[in-house]
């Protein structure tokens, strides 16, 4: 059985990618666009545990950017034990990933693809 992913794996994988910035507060990673604006590609899921109360970080789940809503739908349909969504993410190209259900190898692919979605084209092309 493949080892399941952890937040430490997320951090290690994300920080190996070019020009990645880790958030000073919270658990999130981004890459600057051409103008220097940070574009998030992986972050902790902020779960609403109690209705009408603030969302709280769920350390076992990350949100990962995907290329488009078609890819999101495909991931959600193919592996619902690994990937899910919630109404907050309706119409937004990201999936929620259960870390205890995804292998480190799969996590590497997800994070690299998420980074490519947000990185400037010239930077993303060098990483291929």
Regions found by a protein language model. Give the residues of each.
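Charge-dense, helix-prone N-terminal extensions
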Residues: 1-128
